[in-house]
């Protein structure tokens, strides 16, 4: 036999059939286990071993010479020892030494030990004398031809697979199943030759089958098995085996339910194992009685319990799951077939094919294990039956092992068909990558599923054009197919796609957008007539670069396809004239190059983003890594408010160009979007295929620093952390966002927003707009004409002012609903929500002047105007007068009077403006010397600061 075996299952199979036996069988199990372990290194043949100096007498009738002749006829090597070059197995049973040996060269039958055994253990015709047993070895070539005949089972299994794959009719399926059963019958007959029970029943059954179309060959085989006497064993065995074939066909039925298939597994176990157990056990118990041995209940129970150990319905449930997997894959595949991809259907074909093989081999192994277990258990305590039990166990174990090895070949046969179909498809489609075609189909299906949502994005995002970029990431089905077909070197980790939408219509984006994942280019500058656009990264976009894979063998059946990435260090983003919004938080910038045992990132690499925005009022939401932004023309904002990528530290005090900032961030330990490399595993029987691929995941990391460079940026929005902003000498616009932020406008006319949190804001020099937002904020205006804003729900703010013509706007409160009172040196203003705005040291200078002789005021800590939501206002002078009048608190009636007077003044202004317009219109109808032209226009009392106040209200 030229087939190299892997007998890892032999040791397990023999061990499982012997563990329930007693006494000497324990030592037999140890011996065979050791032998099986040795044979794992590679048994290649059957060897009849004859020691160098062993003498035997051909005339003694012991049959050894016949055995040698039988081996030679079968082409089995007869090895006469020239040295100690064959490692023999250890003790098998007490008085039996090295009858059956398993070595690294092959399966060794020890001629002298077999000879001694046959001479020593002579029994009556019930079991056959040693001479007749030896004669049977030579005539029927029992043990040797039994091992060889298993090849028939392998071929039959492949025939069954082919029949199922070709969807043949039920008769052909039945024939293939019975051919498989027939091969098993031959193996059993050869393995238990001393059971003289098959002849008449098998012959009769064979004659009947000869009359059935398509089954004549099987009938011939059954009919012509001769040399056996009448007994009641045969029909039970045959019926059990046929039930097994039927169950195997049920397991192979792609339309059968899981419950039905699991039931078929139990049926197989009950019918095959049950009938065989009954027949074999009853026969051997009868032989024990004939030999004068015990046939008590415990012996029968031992036989039954040992056989029960060989039954594993769970294995059939596993097979049923395989067919269910095939069925679900086929259903899943239907949609993608319509999109031009049949990979899922190929996977279903593989699962169905290998499931058929599993069903066939499991049926055979179940029967073999039951027979071996029954014979071994029946032999307990009987020296006479020991050699038969040993040989039956050994040979059935070898058969099972050969089947398992052959099953791998059959699995590979199915996998090769898948491989060939993929290669043929690529050949017929101009060399296109089959697996890339799979990603294309996945993308198209996703696009179809989400089209309604995508078509509504123009409205939702308020953009004339929406650019949607979708990254199809690793697909496990595609990975399975690549591994099974041995084409892992061709598979991709994924593929990126781009779509465009305008006015609720889907456009082909290839002429509008350039997306090059290999070079790292995203160009959306061709905006056409669109004035606004939104660039949406629907799924995490993997880092740019190209992939290359290399498949290497790491073990006998183990392979790994290594991933090599030629990375590009940055994404280059180019925008045009439209006002665009980019959300970069879904662009993967962090690469986990080293992970610990818990999958935490301990070493990273970064891919930066370089964005050139062009014209338009653009918004950029920054992601997890280094970002360089040139805002170009227009009012451009950079947002750090999405994601969780560390607090900002901005120091622009030394910047020489307006809109230039360096933003430092420290991202504390936690989870962040990373690109990592993982391994996909696909199994083809014993063959294990590992394929490395990259994908995005929120990985835990130890923290990292990153630095952003901003140019021509008009406004920066902070994070949810505690940010620090230090402005330039130019006009800055900062929004702290959430967190406890520290914002210093420095020079320039700055717009400073605290956002949520208890912020500290200093306007510095210049006419600043300061909005503390929610939280208890500390606000300082500094020099210049500053505007402060407070809203209901903003909390309790404290304001410090020194110089300039400053204003405080309560943008959603009526002035007369506020409460003004003096608390120590401070003015405290309370709104209807009992939130307080404290203007520090409002009364300090005046009190010093009252108490200190000749004191000259050096500071003005007051706010010159306090304004309500409708523009009504009260001046600092009016506040002082009414506080003094009310003895520390402004009376509500006095405050209402101030508001009413302002409203009257406002109406007067409106009337004055209307009169101006009327006079201007009338003058067009008069001559230049008309006396009406000398009417004096009333002096406008409109405060030039109103435009600033209106801005404050709008804010």
UniProtKB/Swiss-Prot annotation:
Record-annotated membrane-spanning stretches: 232-252, 299-319, 361-381, 383-403
Entry's family note: Belongs to the RTX prokaryotic toxin (TC 1.C.11) family.
Note: The lktCABD operon has a complex mosaic structure that has been derived by extensive inter- and intraspecies horizontal DNA transfer and intragenic recombination events.
Highest taxon of the lineage: Bacteria
Domain remark text: The transmembrane domains are believed to be involved in pore formation in target cells. The Gly-rich region is probably involved in calcium binding, which is required for target cell-binding and cytolytic activity.
Molecular-function GO terms, alphabetical: calcium ion binding; channel activity; toxin activity
Entry protein name: Leukotoxin
Role noted for this protein: Pasteurella leukotoxins are exotoxins that attack host leukocytes and especially polymorphonuclear cells, by causing cell rupture. The leukotoxin binds to the host LFA-1 integrin and induces a signaling cascade leading to many biological effects, including tyrosine phosphorylation of the CD18 tail, elevation of the intracellular Ca(2+) and lysis of the host cell. This leukotoxin is a major contributor to the pathogenesis of lung injury in ovine pneumonic pasteurellosis. It also has weak hemolytic activity.
The species this protein was found in: Bibersteinia trehalosi (Pasteurella trehalosi)
GO biological process terms, semicolon-separated: killing of cells of another organism
Post-translational modification: Acylated by LktC. The toxin only becomes active when modified.
